[in-house]
Curated annotation (Swiss-Prot):
Its main location: secreted. The modification Phenylalanine amide is found at residues 119, 136. This is Callisulfakinin. One of its GO terms (cellular component) is extracellular region. In brain, it is specifically expressed in four pairs of neurons. Not expressed in other cells of the brain and in the thoracico-abdominal ganglion. The lineage of its organism: Eukaryota, Metazoa, Ecdysozoa, Arthropoda, Hexapoda. Disulfide bonds: none annotated. Keywords: Amidation, Cleavage on pair of basic residues, Neuropeptide, Secreted, Signal, Sulfation. Residues 31-109, 139-140 form a propeptide.
Amino acid sequence: MYSQQRIFNSKYFIFFIAVLSIFWLPTMSARNLENSKNENGISGSNSGNGKMNSQYNTGSPSAYYSAKHNLRSMLMAPKDYQQKLHAKIPLNLDLMDFLLEYEDEDRSKRFDDYGHMRFGKRGGEEQFDDYGHMRFGRSI
């Protein structure tokens, strides 16, 4: 009994897929084709001079609209994806000068002698011991 019901269900499923592929998919593709024709301004009827609609012969959209689209996508994008409009490094500094200056100032503040990052001070003494391990409790 159970195997016959299972066979009936599988036959019903195959029949449903066949009907779907025969009737529904061609109508959807034809509907998409109609929509694309309407968006491009193509009409099936010919005008009096034997040519298609005048919008069909105008060509591709101008660069003005594509640039406007790109500008809109840049301005509406999340902050992470937006282009930076200003330089992070001032123009009068050379890149090597900037890197050397950055390394001298901030590295001594942020890292200890072992290369471990400092997170701040606790009670006037450093938060790390001589081996770079973080102190949590009493001082040594």
